[in-house]
Amino acid sequence: MGRRAPDRLDRGVTTTSPRTQAPPQAGRGVHATARIRATSHDGVTVLPLLRSDGPFHLRQLRNHGSQARVCVVSAMSAPLGGDRLAIDVSVEAGAQLEITTAAATLALRGATTDHATYDVTLTVGEQATLYWLPQPLISTRGSNLRQTYTVDLAPTARLILREELILGRAHEPPGDLSSHLTVHRDGRPLLAQHTTFGSTAPGWDGPAVLGEHRATGQILIVDPAFANAPPATRLLGDEPANGEGIVAPLAGPAVLATALAPTATPLRHLLDDAVRPRTPCST
């Protein structure tokens, strides 16, 4: 995540305890899980659990009213090949939480040919709200990342989830990238989506998928209020060469905005036009 460090000598240090773990063996990656738990206390959201680990340094920002805010700051280059990274977030009944990242996440090659994994688990309770608003994920040449989102929502929970994928840095091809999003609401499936790019997905850059575009993203909004007033379907973008997208209701109180564009900037503009969540990481 964030800027690439000159080396990884800092790997194996956990930010929440004084212990220092042994450095990883050659050819193996880092195994780390950061955890966040938000609860409501007298109408204000507090964070009884905020545990950093590995490359994830969790920084608590000033509350926005009753809403707690956390920014994930990169403590080292990650994910690299062989890494097994995870973030586990639980927003309990009545709590409100916004999570952002300080910079884009770079999927990098690393010292091993093994793939990296990045697993995000989001659990949102009754009358609770979660904004998951990270900066883009950039798949760089030679990288191999498998990313998963597993989301479990209570019937009255609200969620805004943003994902932006950038396929390759300027003038270079991407690595291999797969992203799997699974959302359950009240124990029932709401959305299951699996996208794959790179050498393992023939045709990903053909006219039926991305064509000449190298940036794709989506915003998922789940809100019980949509049960009575679902948003209308509408198209995004006036010029296909500069990017295009669609906002469409799902079979549930949810709406999904998806877009693709040549680069990160027009992609962000398209998604911002679809819905406008709060912007990240300002104190």
Curated annotation (Swiss-Prot):
Location(s) in or outside the cell: Cytoplasm
Biased composition (Basic and acidic residues): 1-11
Principal localisation: cytoplasm
Biased composition (Polar residues): 13-23
Pfam families, A to Z: UreD
Keyword DNA damage: no
Subunit structure: UreD, UreF and UreG form a complex that acts as a GTP-hydrolysis-dependent molecular chaperone, activating the urease apoprotein by helping to assemble the nickel containing metallocenter of UreC. The UreE protein probably delivers the nickel.
Function statement: Required for maturation of urease via the functional incorporation of the urease nickel metallocenter.
Family named by the database record: Belongs to the UreD family.
HAMAP family: UreD (MF_01384)
Name of this chain's protein: Urease accessory protein UreD 2
